[in-house]
Regions:
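Thiol-based oxidoreductase modules, predominantly thioredoxin-like and allied folds used
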Residues: 29-39
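Local sequence-structure signature of Cys/Sec-based thiol-disulfide redox active-site neighborhoods
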Residues: 1-19
Length: 78
């Protein structure tokens, strides 16, 4: 499963990447986290608030750190 984390490299962006990787490891779900820092590409997703998370081409989260339960839901739904 490919998961894109959109953001300029801010602290919450880095924590979002780490949270996704931690939950994936705990759940034994293979994921590839792709960090997107190019603002043109981020805006192309219609995102104005970061970090944002994109799964399957859809923005599933934007703005602030997602909680662990939400990340678990993404990984089990995929």
């Amino acid at each position: 499963m490919d998961i894109k984390v959109l953001g300029p490299g801010c602290a919450n962006c880095k924590r979002t990447v780490q949270l996704i990787e931690d939950v994936a490891r705990d759940r034994a779900v293979p994921v590839t986290v792709i960090k997107i820092e190019d603002m043109r590409e981020i805006v192309g997703y219609g995102v104005m608030s970061t970090p944002a998370v994109v799964i399957g081409g859809k923005v599933v989260h934007a703005g602030g750190l997602p909680n662990r339960a939400k990340v678990e839901q993404w990984l089990t739904a995929g």
